[in-house]
Amino acid sequence: MVDVHAQRKQIEKLISLNRVTKVVKGGRRFSFAAFMVVGDGEGHVGWGFGKANDASDAIKKSLTSARKNLRFVPIRKGTLPHEVIGCFKKAKVLIKPATHGTGVIAGGPVRAVMEALGVHDILSKSLGSNNSMNVVKATFKAFDLVLNAEKVAEMRGKTLKTLWG
């Protein structure tokens, strides 16, 4: 868990705001469920979910939850270092690095995550389920698989100097 929201600007993206219903003996009881992504645009990003009787309270809860869930993703030259595939339930997300000037080529929820993360050039394809919550969670599973040069060198038991020649 990274506490970056205290000192940096935040990019907040609302993925979904749903009115949900609970049927009780006296009728229907309505509440709101909010799903958000928060990032600093410099490699830190997190998602959050919140439910409340009022939409603004649900958004506040999801924002608090997202700030608690921040994680670091290594970014190199405005894109990810290598291709990754993330899966969560039946949602599958393919993320490929792109050259400078390509832009963010991604569908709704993945685009919001990439913009909050600070990625400027990326190719992405969402496969399987299009449930926005599962797609975002699959994107975060893909982020867990992203390796930077230091991690690769450590896994191979080499230094960065010998790895790059």
Swiss-Prot record:
This is Small ribosomal subunit protein uS5. Residues 10-73 form the S5 DRBM domain. The N-terminal domain interacts with the head of the 30S subunit; the C-terminal domain interacts with the body and contacts protein S4. The interaction surface between S4 and S5 is involved in control of translational fidelity. GO terms for molecular function: rRNA binding; structural constituent of ribosome. Belongs to the universal ribosomal protein uS5 family. With S4 and S12 plays an important role in translational accuracy. InterPro entries: Ribosomal_Su5_D2-typ_SF, Ribosomal_uS5, Ribosomal_uS5_bac-type, Ribosomal_uS5_C, Ribosomal_uS5_N, Ribosomal_uS5_N_CS, Ribsml_uS5_D2-typ_fold_subgr. One of its GO terms (biological process) is translation. It holds the Pfam family Ribosomal_S5_C.
